[in-house]
Curated annotation (Swiss-Prot):
Main location: cytoplasm
Molecular function via GO: DNA binding
Localization terms from the record: Cytoplasm
Entry's family note: Belongs to the TACO1 family.
Keyword flag DNA-binding: yes
Transcription is among the record's keywords: yes
Phylogenetic classification of the source organism: Bacteria, Pseudomonadati, Pseudomonadota, Gammaproteobacteria, Moraxellales
Protein name: Probable transcriptional regulatory protein Pcryo_1479
Any Gene Ontology CC annotation: cytosol
Database matches in HAMAP family: Transcrip_reg_TACO1
Matching PANTHER family: TRANSCRIPTIONAL REGULATORY PROTEIN YEBC-RELATED (PTHR12532:SF6), TRANSLATIONAL ACTIVATOR OF CYTOCHROME C OXIDASE 1 (PTHR12532)
Species the sequence originates in: Psychrobacter cryohalolentis (strain ATCC BAA-1226 / DSM 17306 / VKM B-2378 / K5)
Key words, A-Z: Cytoplasm, DNA-binding, Transcription, Transcription regulation
Length: 249
């Protein structure tokens, strides 16, 4: 949990930086269109669409922009057809990396993804090489641990799988399909989370305890996230406290 929250902090800082450039908006709109095209346009009946709308709202995308993207997805425009492909590989130190993409040119995408791995002493693996190390789930976090009893009561009653407390924050874990329902229940009880997302959570972690390797991993992930076709990058990296302190300087 501690390692996860530290890595999440780095990811969220980068997400805010990307949002300024509009890159996050572009990627989320693409995902909304795809989710609406492949499922029900009503987010209450489409867990995937609900999850990506929550993501859009978390970066302050307007409801109007979201609704237009949903309308695009239900309009049947062939120009919006994209292949959704996941790539798997390893970074330095045995760090497992899962890359989710949406693309209209598979050759371009795999070339750019492979380059990001090899440029940073990693390697692109075969399908199934690391995916088994990740579980898709909903995560709802609270920075105020004093809310534990209230959060636990509401979340478990709404069907949450577990609540973790690492002494610094609370993490509510849900099945990804039930993420929206649990979040709504918490909101209705006045328990507004500090972060909420559907993610691929690693079942094991790869420890990095030196700055050189950590910087290499960070650079690789930055390069992957900067690829236009890449939607999400997940990793099981865990930095030691000493390395984290130096990375945050």
């Amino acid at each position: 949990m501690a390692g996860h929250s530290k890595w999440a902090n780095i990811k969220h800082r980068k997400a805010r930086q990307d949002a300024v450039k509009g890159k996050v908006f572009t990627k989320i709109i693409r995902e909304i269109v795809s989710a609406a095209k492949q499922g029900d346009p009503d987010p209450d009946k489409n867990p995937r669409l609900r999850a990506v709308i929550e993501k859009a709202l978390s970066v302050n995308m307007t409801r109007d922009t979201i609704n237009r993207a949903v309308a695009r997805g239900t309009g049947g425009d062939d120009n919006d057809n994209m292949d959704e492909v996941s790539y798997e590989g390893y970074g330095i130190g045995g760090v497992a990396v899962l890359v989710e993409t949406m693309t209209d040119n598979l050759n371009r995408t795999v070339s750019e993804v492979r380059h990001a791995f090899t440029k940073n002493d990693g390697n692109l693996g075969t399908t199934g090489s690391v995916a088994y190390l990740f579980n898709k789930r909903g995560e709802i976090s609270f920075n105020d641990t004093s809310l534990e009893d209230e959060v636990m009561l509401v979340a478990l009653d709404a069907g949450a799988l577990d609540i973790e407390n690492d002494g610094e924050s609370l993490l509510v874990i849900t099945e990804w399909e039930n993420f929206g329902h649990v979040k709504d229940a918490l909101n209705a009880a006045g328990l507004v989370s500090d972060n909420a997302e559907v993610t691929m959570s690693p079942s094991t972690s790869a420890e990095i305890d030196n700055v050189a390797d950590a910087e290499k991993v960070m650079k690789m992930i930055d390069m992957l996230e900067d690829i236009d076709d890449v939607q999400e990058v997940y990793s099981n990296v865990n930095f030691s406290d000493e390395v984290m302190a130096q990375l945050e300087q």
